[in-house]
A protein has these predicted regions:
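A structural signal for isolated positions on well-ordered beta-strands in alpha/beta enzyme cores
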Residues: 6-8, 32-34, 119-120, 155
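N-terminal Rossmann NAD(P)H-binding glycine-rich loop of SDR-like oxidoreductase domains
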Residues: 2-29
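NAD(P)H-binding glycine-rich loop region in Rossmannoid oxidoreductase-like domains
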Residues: 7, 35, 48-106, 110-113
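Short, polar loop motifs at secondary-structure junctions
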Residues: 35-42
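Conserved Rossmann-fold NAD(P)-dependent oxidoreductase catalytic core, especially the SDR/UDP-sugar
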Residues: 84, 90-140, 148, 155
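Short beta-strand/turn micro-motifs composed of small residues
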Residues: 11, 37, 123, 158
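Oxidoreductase cofactor-interface core, primarily capturing Rossmann-like NAD(P)-dependent enzymes
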Residues: 28-31, 128-227
Length: 227
């Protein structure tokens, strides 16, 4: 059952975040999308951009204050679409940790402190803190960081190769079409739609759920078929 809701999103100006915002706005029950950004963006209907310094020591507190205001108008869910994707090879592990754990962790804590119950987290296929591979390991550490915040509902999205994305080279998408299962291709619009569906349909459920490619595609198709 759908209900009126708002979403507060970090990373909404990126490729995947933009797809999630578009799918949320396509849902009539979404009253507002609040985007935390580092700089001002062009005005859009039902979108409120709030400029915050994500690297500031009080970022969590400022997020909490913002979230409380949005919650005063009705149900709110939080979304993190932060990620560097294919650009991760150019980042040091320290830089990745500062973004994926530091910034995302502070955002999550602020949302939780404000009283938001549902958090949607963009991760990556195979994410585990025990991995030998740096990017996958950092994704797993990010999941653990948000998990430890204690949301009543945590939805983790683990896409494989994201296509329809300016950051994904064509040859990588071709390679992904040959890879079966959770590490293969998924279109960013489907990923965004599955996030919108999670918020619209499952915000009042409890517990943690992890969705990989097949589950995201199924949920997005179900959501798309509902008038």
């Amino acid at each position: 059952m759908k209900q009126n809701f708002a979403a507060i999103i970090l990373g909404g100006t990126g490729q995947v975040g933009g797809a999630a915002v578009a799918e949320l706005l396509a849902t009539s029950e979404c009253r507002e999308v609040v985007m935390i950004t580092r700089k001002a963006i062009a005005p859009r209907s039902r979108v409120r951009a709030v400029v915050l310094d994500t690297g500031a020591a009080d970022f969590a507190e400022r997020t909490a204050a913002l979230a409380r205001g949005v919650l005063s108008q009705g149900p709110v869910s939080a979304v993190s679409c932060v990620g560097v994707g294919s650009g991760s090879t150019r980042w040091s592990e320290e830089e990745l940790l500062r973004l994926e754990l530091g910034v995302v962790g502070a955002f999550a804590r602020g949302c939780h402190d404000a009283g938001i119950a549902q958090f949607c987290l963009l991760s990556a296929a195979g994410g585990t803190a025990r991995s030998r591979f740096r990017y996958v390991r950092v994704m797993g550490m990010k999941e653990d960081t948000v998990r430890n915040v204690g949301f009543a509902r945590l939805a983790i999205f683990r896409p494989g190769i994201i296509v329809g994305n300016a950051h994904t080279p064509a040859w990588v998408g071709w390679l992904g079409s040959l890879v079966p299962g959770s590490f293969g291709n998924i279109d960013q619009r489907i990923l965004g739609r599955s996030i919108a569906a999670e918020i619209a349909w499952h915000s009042r459920e409890a517990g943690e759920i992890t969705r990989e490619n097949a589950a995201m595609k199924k949920l997005a198709a179900q959501f798309n078929s509902v008038p």
